[in-house]
């Protein structure tokens, strides 16, 4: 069964960049894996590391700052996840430990892929996202709460509302991926299959 997402409070890391594409999120040389595990080690590889092997962390990249270690909420700017449609991008973010991404806008395919992989992309206005950036950057250890049931983001005593498709919300709240959705109708499927003539089975 997929992971449920109801409410999450976590340390937020501010990635102050617009139009972050999927090749930056997970470069093409790391796409050979056939399972979802292990991509987190290569997340933002070209930015996080100074060498090709990934052994020399770039001290100037925000995800490497000591204050943001263990972050589970990513703040980003507009058009996050643009570029190719590789599903490995949300796999890498999820494997790294990111549970929610907050940005003014997302590339459509990335947005859908994230939801399909039980990671919540939250769209807020540019002004609201900018407020969150300023709060997180000014307060070490700042956390943000994302409440999918209430469709709110809370931080620094303020609450922001976001919209999400009701079907997508239902799937996340109940931990339902495509297989889980199918299994909700398991009895009906079994009943239908039992009525199929033997020569058609």
UniProtKB/Swiss-Prot annotation:
Q: Record's InterPro entries?
A: 3-IsopropMal_deHydase_ssu (IPR004431), Aconitase/3IPM_dehydase_swvl (IPR015928), AconitaseA/IPMdHydase_ssu_swvl (IPR000573), IPMI_Swivel (IPR033940), LeuD (IPR050075)
GO function term, MF aspect, one:
3-isopropylmalate dehydratase activity
**UniProt keyword terms in alphabetical order:** Amino-acid biosynthesis, Branched-chain amino acid biosynthesis, Leucine biosynthesis, Lyase
Catalyzed reaction equations: (2R,3S)-3-isopropylmalate = (2S)-2-isopropylmalate
Q: Does the keyword Transferase apply?
A: no
| Biological process according to GO | L-leucine biosynthetic process
Q: Which CDD domains match?
A: IPMI_Swivel (cd01577)
Which region is the signal sequence? none
The Enzyme Commission number assigned here is 4.2.1.33
Task: Give the record's GO CC terms.
Answer: 3-isopropylmalate dehydratase complex
Instruction: Give one Pfam hit by family name.
Output: Aconitase_C
Q: In which pathway does it act?
A: Amino-acid biosynthesis; L-leucine biosynthesis; L-leucine from 3-methyl-2-oxobutanoate: step 2/4
Query: What does it do?
Result: Catalyzes the isomerization between 2-isopropylmalate and 3-isopropylmalate, via the formation of 2-isopropylmaleate.
Subunit record text: Heterodimer of LeuC and LeuD.
Spell out the family assignment given in the record's similarity comment.
Answer: Belongs to the LeuD family. LeuD type 1 subfamily.
Protein name per the record: 3-isopropylmalate dehydratase small subunit
Question: What is the scientific name of the source organism?
Answer: Glaesserella parasuis serovar 5 (strain SH0165) (Haemophilus parasuis)
The taxonomy runs: Bacteria, Pseudomonadati, Pseudomonadota, Gammaproteobacteria, Pasteurellales
Q: Which gene encodes it?
A: leuD
């Amino acid at each position: 069964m997929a992971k449920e997402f109801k409410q999450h409070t976590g340390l937020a890391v501010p990635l102050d960049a617009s139009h972050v594409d999927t090749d930056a999120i997970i470069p093409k040389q790391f796409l050979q894996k056939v399972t979802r595990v292990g991509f987190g080690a290569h997340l933002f590889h070209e930015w996080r590391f100074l060498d090709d092997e990934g052994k020399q962390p770039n001290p100037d990249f925000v995800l490497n700052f000591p204050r943001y270690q263990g972050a589970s909420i990513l703040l980003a700017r507009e058009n996050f996840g643009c570029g190719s449609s590789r599903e490995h991008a949300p796999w890498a973010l999820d494997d790294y430990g990111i549970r929610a991404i907050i940005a003014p806008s997302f590339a459509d395919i990335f947005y859908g892929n994230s939801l399909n992989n039980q990671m919540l992309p939250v769209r807020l206005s540019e002004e609201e996202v900018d407020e969150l950036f300023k709060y997180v950057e000014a307060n070490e250890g700042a956390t943000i709460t994302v409440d999918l049931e209430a469709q709110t983001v809370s931080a620094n005593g303020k609450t922001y509302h976001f919209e999400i498709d009701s079907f997508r919300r239902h799937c996340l709240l109940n931990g339902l991926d495509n297989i889980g959705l199918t299994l909700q109708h398991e009895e009906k499927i079994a009943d239908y299959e039992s009525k199929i003539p033997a020569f058609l089975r």
